[in-house]
Design a protein with these regions (language model features):
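Histidine/acidic-residue-rich, glycine-tolerant segments that coordinate divalent metal ions
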Residues: 24-43, 49-50, 55, 67-178, ...
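Metal-dependent amide/peptide-bond hydrolase catalytic core
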Residues: 152-331
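N-terminal beta-rich core of secreted/periplasmic extracellular enzymes
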Residues: 11-31
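Hydrophobic residues positioned within well-ordered beta-strands of beta-sheet architectures
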Residues: 2, 75, 129-131, 194, ...
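Structural motif
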Residues: 12-14, 102, 126-128, 286-290
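A non-catalytic alpha/beta surface segment that caps or lines the substrate-entry region
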Residues: 1-11
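Alpha-helix C-terminal capping segments
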Residues: 60-65, 278-282
Length: 331
């Protein structure tokens, strides 16, 4: 197949995987499961083991057919997708700065197996924050007045964050996911640790939610005379795919699956830090999109009984076997 472009291009094929530190616990399961990690009590529970397998399969095929290509192909395995933590440090290495075409992917969503969509829907921009409150311990019966209660500061912040006024008619979200505090029932809590996230359909909406959350956290710490340290733990931007990349992906998809299964999905997919990589590619003149390989699942993503139809791995391989030659093929 002849290449579509007169100059060599660099398509970046992207797979993400999650190691065990972001996996879910299985310790309280009463039903047998089909997939668990070698680390006892953990599983991927989102399909990242499948993404890794897809990537390895594509790498093997590329290696076997190197004489058929005229460009450079980068296959990137991204750690720490959960919590949108892995993309930013990878983009800062410059690995995506010379990429002409970029394709990210994710499997699952309990769609009919064989579904392929380079127009999956909406990814929200998101910021993940960790807040550490520091107060002063004191005996809660003898000298409570000497303490500075970090637990109350954290609790006040959690309530205030969930009371943030939302822009009318706009898509935003927030959640305080964890709040851990204190040392004992008779000790004024000297510390508290909070994990939270905000989201918005645009960068501007996400920034509004982030700034409001930070403001509430700082004000709550001040109310209880505590100190607070706020750290950005992860981020994702909004999803803005390129039509040229979408059209290439549809051509490849329709060579693999039916016309009915190669289609826009219109899903609301939370957040995806692959968008950070895509934006970096676009800032340097490249194009890209994000492809969903739908398949049936035994439970929802991030649930303890999650498993996926492994037929999707072969479908994804055939998709890239069609896509790659369109961009860098020489025969």
């Amino acid at each position: 197949m002849s290449p579509l472009f007169s100059k060599p291009v660099v398509p970046a094929l992207f797979w993400q995987f999650v190691s065990t530190w972001t996996a879910l616990t299985l310790m309280k399961l009463t039903k047998p499961v089909t997939v668990r990690l070698m680390k006892a009590g953990h599983m991927h529970s989102c399909g990242h083991d499948g993404h890794t397998t897809m990537g390895i399969a594509v790498c093997n095929w590329i290696q076997e057919n190197l004489d058929q290509f005229c460009g450079t192909i980068k296959v990137v395995f991204q750690p720490a997708e959960e919590g949108v933590r892995g993309a930013r440090p990878m983009t800062e290495t410059g690995i995506f700065d010379d990429v002409d075409f970029f394709f990210g992917n994710h499997l699952g969503f309990n769609l009919p197996t064989g579904t392929i969509s380079p127009e999956p829907g909406v990814f929200l921009a998101s910021t993940k924050l960790d807040a550490t409150f520091t107060g002063l311990a004191a005996h809660s019966g003898a000298d409570p007045q000497k303490g500075k209660n970090a637990l109350l500061a954290g609790a006040a912040a959690a309530l205030a964050i969930h009371g943030i006024t939302r822009p009318i008619g706009e898509v935003t979200a927030l959640n305080v996911g964890t709040l851990v505090a204190g040392q004992g029932r008779n000790v004024v809590a000297p510390n508290a640790f909070m994990q939270l996230e905000v989201r918005g359909e645009t960068e501007e909406l996400n920034a509004y939610m982030r700034d409001q959350a930070i403001r509430k956290i700082k004000a709550s710490a001040d109310m209880y005379d505590c100190q607070v340290d706020i750290v950005k733990a992860g981020e994702a931007t909004e999803f803005k795919p390129d039509q040229e990349a979408i059209e290439l992906a549809y051509i490849a998809a329709r060579n693999v699956t039916t016309e009915e299964l190669a289609r826009p999905l219109g899903l609301k997919l939370g957040s995806e830090d692959c968008t950070i990589m895509l934006r970096r590619v676009q800032q340097h003149g490249g194009k890209g999109t994000f492809v969903v390989f739908g398949c049936r699942t035994s439970a929802g993503h991030h649930q303890r009984l999650f498993d996926f139809d492994e037929e999707v791995i072969g479908i994804a391989l055939r998709f890239y076997q069609n896509l790659i030659p369109m961009i860098v093929g020489i025969k």
